[in-house]
Amino acid sequence: QSDLTELLAANNVYTGDLTINSASTLTAAEAQGGKLGIVNGNVYITQSSTAIDAAKLQTVVSKIVTVIGAVSYTHSGTGVTGVNFDKLTGAGSIKLDQEAPVSLSSLVSVGALEIVDDVKITSIDLSALTSVTSFNDGTTANALGGSKVTSIDLGSLPRYDVAAGALTLELSTSGDTTLDLALLTTTDNSTGLVEKLDLTVTGGDDLSLPLFVKGDISATNVKSLVLPKFIYTASTDGTLAVTASKLESI
């Protein structure tokens, strides 16, 4: 144990929980410098006042690359500028409850990912994500997005494996919206077999699922739907329901 402690101390590793909820705790976090590259613990950040300097907080957050435990970020308040975990590549779990667009553009792997639905979230960038245990929008399991979201980028995600075999993605029903699911397959990560994934999508004007094979698809408010490999069976393993109010091509 002593050898491990010395090894962690010699590298860019912070051991223990990192809590930032005031100007003084932010100052303490700044003093850790590069040791925040890997947090061997949890990260708890509450930003609800301009007393916490947003620029300084962003500098600290941008040092965090890997969190062994949980990341919890709460952001609210008039005039309070939110921060992004722009360098975070992996975490045990993440919960974001913020009043601003979500950018986790470097995130590759995470356990449970909860992004609480809020009217001020207009975009969700998970463009590097390749592995996630589950999504949650704060009230519903296996759900991501919200009524004001105009863009969701899951362009690197190859599979969503949950016992429920279901995923719900919600975007705004007005204006132009984009949804990137370019690599989403219905192949089980562990067995390599094609397994059913029920996908419910609201929005995503030009919805393309080039690798999606098996499951029930429900699409609302889409203009075009591309399913080159989808096996339609008109049964419980391959139904297709499309609300045609904006549909131009399928």
Locate each region found by the language model:
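Beta-solenoid repeat scaffold
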Residues: 31, 59-64
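Extracellular/surface-exposed low-complexity segments
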Residues: 1-9
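Concave beta-strand-loop units of leucine-rich repeat
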Residues: 12-25, 40-51, 62-84, 90-101, ...
